[in-house]
């Protein structure tokens, strides 16, 4: 079942939800053999996989804070480095590659990358729902590739989840953030540990719960804050408790 509330055509700034789109383009590139997850990219010793999983050691603005694979350091600069690397390897501007590899095939015609590949996309609800559907049942990627991308990359790394503090096991996939057993967290207490997605500082999120076989997309123009810290988990638990939106036994 699909339930849409609000203006589905109005574009919203996605903020860091943009990283899911950037990561998906990079994953498509690996299947096209334009990139390899284990190829060198970013600081010495780092790979494409390190950049996707916030494990390259790069800090938020590009400073090297740790050796690759030793800490989970959330880094916009890492995703910008990844996009630049993909552009160099493909010979195509990253925004064009994203459009050709992801947006056009999913009929996301109103989505635009207007700034950083880490946080600069804009999209309406209808387009993000199409992308969420792809994450539930992939057509652009092999099932095995998406399964790898939504499994823990570089397990055991601690780090800070923006807005929610330090996590002893700050698990991340190859782009998506993984719910696992993080606490506190922006997902609902009833969401499966295998749930994955991303939220953005513009008050946006995209979450996929594979156990419930559902996805939830929220787009707002209210900056992330305490309203989201308390409200999003309650909202997601309410969705899971709704027998129409999340039928028992799915």
Each model region followed by its residue ranges:
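Active-site-proximal loop and beta-strand segments within enzyme catalytic domains
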Residues: 2, 6-96
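Sec-exported extracytoplasmic/periplasmic mature domains
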Residues: 30-31, 53-57, 103, 107, ...
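Short, hydrophobic secondary-structure boundary micro-motifs
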Residues: 37-39, 60-64, 111-114, 143-144, ...
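Secretory-pathway/luminal and periplasmic proteins that interact with or process carbohydrate-rich
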Residues: 57-61, 106-113, 154-161
């Amino acid at each position: 079942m699909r339930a849409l509330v609000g203006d589905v055509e109005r574009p919203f700034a996605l903020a860091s939800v943009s990283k899911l789109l950037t990561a998906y383009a990079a994953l498509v590139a690996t299947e096209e053999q334009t990139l390899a997850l284990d190829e060198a990219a970013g600081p010495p010793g780092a790979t494409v996989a390190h950049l996707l999983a916030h494990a390259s050691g790069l800090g938020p603005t590009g400073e090297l804070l740790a050796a690759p694979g030793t800490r989970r350091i959330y880094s916009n600069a890492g995703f910008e480095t990844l996009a630049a690397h993909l552009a160099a390897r493909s010979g195509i501007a990253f925004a064009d590659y994203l459009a050709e590899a992801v947006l056009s095939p999913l009929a996301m015609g109103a989505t635009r990358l207007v700034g950083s590949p880490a946080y600069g996309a804009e999209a309406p609800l209808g387009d993000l729902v199409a992308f969420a559907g792809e994450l539930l049942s992939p057509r652009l990627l092999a099932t095995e590739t998406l399964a790898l991308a939504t499994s823990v990359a570089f397990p055991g790394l601690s780090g800070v989840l923006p807005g929610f503090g330090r996590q002893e096991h700050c698990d991340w996939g190859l782009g998506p953030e993984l719910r696992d057993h993080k606490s506190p967290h922006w997902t609902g207490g009833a969401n499966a540990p295998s749930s994955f997605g991303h939220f953005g500082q513009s008050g946006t999120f995209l979450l996929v719960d594979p156990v419930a076989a559902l996805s939830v997309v929220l787009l707002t123009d209210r900056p992330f804050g305490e309203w989201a810290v308390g409200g999003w988990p309650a909202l997601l638990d309410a969705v899971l408790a709704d027998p129409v939106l999340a039928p028992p036994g799915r």
